[in-house]
């Protein structure tokens, strides 16, 4: 080796060591996604676009909401994106888990479909399907209640949307909870089928029940609070990047989730805010208003500071549907202090759909 080559290597060594030290200093955060769903996948945007450069994000898609909640409660993951309807069960089971923010309400993606020739007045004693203990169960319960039925007035069948297609077409079901593409399959094969309500309905939307949320392990918050704050901020930064670069991010999420891009567009939209028949993406300010840590009224008449009320209403419905036995103090399952800290730090984010 000649002198100049050796000197060059020696000169480069400090930079190499510094680079290795920086890489070694990155802190790992374990994040769970309950199912392959665009609304839950914003941490993949954070990871790919390096929006949290001091952290290594380890993302796991569970395809099993209950399994993911169990992993969060056990401390195997730190953060978990899933539906808000599980929050009362977190309280009931006394696990070390809290709901730290609402993320995005359903904006018409969830429907109740009536079979041909069936009228809402004719449902007593008939079979209706919904996946037990999930959003569809609640939507069916609330809609039946709006039509004057108690849960015991119908015969419940525990079916996911895809599983309900066959029984709907065979005439075994009078009504079913569904979402696309299963709605279209039933409508095309069975003219006369009708959607009687969806989650964009004003009365359904203002309940706040049909919502996705971000959960965190309590010990993670207590022992690594700054990391929790950084991760919460990074999630909203990911949403902001999606708003500004919707086409790019939708293509990214299609590859990540292994979905056709058209399906991604249909769920989260192409305008950087929402998709009718899909979901509505809260910006940070809207989520902070629902938490009650920022002035202003969030959309859909849900009310400022309404998170505990939404959890209580969900709990009451789980009792009506006989999945829970008592109504708990809803505040035990909600921790808006992280959102409050971000507000206090001056963090803000507000955006509308692009034309």
Task: Give residue spans per PLM region.
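Bacterial N-terminal signal peptides that target proteins for export
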Residues: 1-10
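Short, glycine-/small- and polar/acidic-enriched structural segments
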Residues: 26-180, 196-199, 207-208, 342
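C-terminal segment of classical bacterial N-terminal signal peptides
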Residues: 14-23
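Pocket-lining segment of extracytoplasmic ligand-binding domains
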Residues: 85, 157, 163-167, 173-264
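Functional cleft and adjacent loop/helix regions within the main domain
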Residues: 65, 243, 335
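Conserved C-terminal helix/tail region of periplasmic/extracytoplasmic solute-binding proteins
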Residues: 308-355
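Extracytoplasmic/periplasmic substrate-binding proteins
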Residues: 114-116, 121-125, 212, 287-296
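Secondary-structure end/capping motifs
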Residues: 223-325
């Amino acid at each position: 080796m000649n002198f100049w080559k050796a000197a060059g290597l020696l000169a480069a060594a400090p930079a190499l060591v510094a680079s290795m030290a920086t890489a070694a200093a990155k802190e790992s955060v374990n994040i769970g996604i309950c199912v392959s769903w665009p609304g839950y996948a914003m941490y993949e945007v954070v990871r790919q676009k390096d929006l949290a450069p001091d952290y290594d994000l380890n993302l796991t898609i569970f395809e099993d909401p209950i399994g993911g909640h169990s992993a969060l409660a056990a401390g195997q993951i730190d953060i978990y994106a899933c539906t808000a309807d599980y929050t009362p069960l977190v309280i009931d089971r006394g696990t070390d888990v809290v709901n730290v923010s609402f993320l995005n309400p359903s904006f018409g993606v969830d429907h109740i479909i009536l079979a041909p020739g069936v009228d809402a007045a004719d449902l007593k004693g008939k079979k209706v399907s919904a996946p037990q203990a999930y959003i569809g169960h609640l939507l069916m319960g609330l809609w039946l209640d709006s039509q004057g039925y108690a849960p015991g007035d119908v015969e419940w069948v525990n079916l996911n949307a895809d599983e309900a297609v066959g029984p709907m077409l065979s005439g075994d079901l009078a009504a079913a909870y569904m979402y696309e593409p299963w709605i279209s399959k039933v409508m095309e094969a069975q003219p006369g089928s009708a959607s009687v309500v969806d989650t964009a309905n004003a009365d359904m939307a203002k309940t706040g029940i049909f919502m996705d949320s971000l959960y965190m392990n309590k010990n993670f918050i207590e022992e690594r609070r700054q990391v929790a704050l950084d991760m919460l901020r990074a999630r909203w930064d990911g949403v902001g990047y999606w708003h500004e670069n919707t086409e790019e991010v939708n293509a990214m999420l299609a590859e990540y989730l292994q979905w056709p891009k058209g399906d991604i567009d249909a769920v989260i939209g192409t305008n950087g805010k929402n998709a009718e028949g899909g979901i509505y993406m809260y910006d940070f300010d809207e989520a902070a208003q629902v938490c009650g840590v920022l002035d202003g009224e969030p959309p859909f008449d849900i009310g400022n500071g309404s998170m505990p009320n939404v959890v209580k209403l969900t709990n009451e419905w789980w009792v009506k549907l006989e999945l829970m036995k008592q109504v708990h103090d809803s505040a035990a399952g909600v921790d808006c202090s992280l959102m409050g800290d971000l507000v206090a730090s001056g963090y803000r984010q507000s955006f509308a759909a692009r034309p």
